[in-house]
């Protein structure tokens, strides 16, 4: 998260039937919500997010950005692509429903063209389907699947597209991937039906958006645990650093959570005494240097602040102890639906505190979702 980022908790739309979409407020699912009056009622505007690999993104952008420019101009939709240092990228499409569907059609037909071109140099005789991956708040996936899978079965049968909702949430988010495969026409019809479901069943609670991780990530230590930095987040590192973790634990044993120890501020473990640890890290200096303290602010909806604080402050104290950061939660302000959290410490402390706060929010929001 950047400075002052807010985690958005959408208001709940009144339930309506499929024939009354024109009466919905302008809805950016996965974004913000605004209401614009137009002739004949309220105009529906959507924001839909797609997850793409680098090669797919390159196809969408085209030479010198010509392809994406053409898509923007001809569809009337806003098409934004996330930063390029990740193997996966988020493509965000925003606009009135007609513009959204035009943009989807252009993307689907472009991918089909890529498949046909790749087959000209391949012995394969059967053309593989076009595949797109949507990113959808987990709390909406239950409505998309339907009771006993009835809704998703209906969408498959009526459009001819294959639709799969991932069982697990995307890392460090409250969103799931929805994979759509088929002909471009089938995909377009499928996306239209999914949009109807999204409008009918807005997200419940706060949505923590998925942010793809960079291809290579530095490593920090805090609380005796190895973490990788992914953008603004500290994520528990995978098994390949188990050996390094064990080395660090041997050098600086940490007490169980809740026991006091003057050596436990949650700071990085001193690795300079272990040559083997340095070699594993791929760098020989700088890990034990203490960077200057900095401050990061974020806002949390009032209805979620309790899960961060915990009973008698137990959860926030755990987060402080594990991260080594100073964390202050502002008092509730009259008329405001949010509380400000100020995190102070080294960049490593702040990243770890953010990760732990997001983990608490993910747990709470997942419990809210009617999946």
From Swiss-Prot:
Widely expressed, with highest levels in testis and fat tissues and lowest in heart. It comes from the Eukaryota. The lineage of its organism: Eukaryota, Metazoa, Chordata, Craniata, Vertebrata. GO terms for biological process: negative regulation of transcription by RNA polymerase II. InterPro entries: KH_dom (IPR004087), KH_dom_type_1 (IPR004088), KH_dom_type_1_sf (IPR036612). The keyword Ribonucleoprotein applies. This is Poly(rC)-binding protein 3. GO terms for molecular function: C-rich single-stranded DNA binding; RNA binding. It is found in: Cytoplasm. Single-stranded nucleic acid binding protein that binds preferentially to oligo dC. The gene is Pcbp3. Residues 45-95, 129-182, 293-357 form the KH domain. Keywords: Cytoplasm, DNA-binding, Repeat, Ribonucleoprotein, RNA-binding. GO terms for cellular component: cytoplasm; ribonucleoprotein complex. Pfam families: KH_1.
